[in-house]
C-alpha cells in the first residue's frame, strides 16, 4: 500500500478471490490466499472485503456473476462511509471452536449472537433450494480430514460439525480447497460463509481428503 502512496484515511475495499480450479479442484492454494486476504484487513486501515465463496466457476477464472460482487462492495461503502443502516453485514468469518463430545461447535463473527425470527442466521442453499449444509471436513489428531456432517444451531448462530469416522475431532475446515461446489452456507441476508480452517498445522502438512 505504501508503494502506491495510499492515503491511510481513504477507504479501501477489495474482493475475495473467487473459487476456481487453478492447479486442481482439491488443492489448497486458493484458500491460503483467502486467509492472507482476510489477515490483511487488520493491517489496512478503513478496509473491507467482499466475499465470493458462492460465485466461483470451475472453468472460468473470471466468474460471470458481477452484480453480487458489486452489491457486496456497495454495502461496505454505504454502511462504513455513508452511515446507511439496515444493510447486510459483511460475510460471516470463523471466530472460535469448542468441543462437545464427538462434535466440534463453531462460532462466527459478523452475525448476531441471537438470530431474531431467523433473520441474520445461517441457511444452506443449492440449485434446487434449501438443503443440508455441505463443504465441511473434520480431522482428529492424525490430521486426516474426512467429509463431515454439519448442523445449524439456528438460535445462537453456531454450526455443529461431526463425522462417524472421527470420534475424537480436533479440527474443522470449510470450503478449504480451490473449488468446492459442496460449500453452500449463506446467511439469510445473502452473504456466503468465508472459507476457513480451525487448525494452524504447518502448510507443508496441510492434510489429506479421504
Language-model features, listed with the residues they occupy:
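Catalytic-domain carbohydrate-binding cleft regions of carbohydrate-active enzymes
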Residues: 1-210
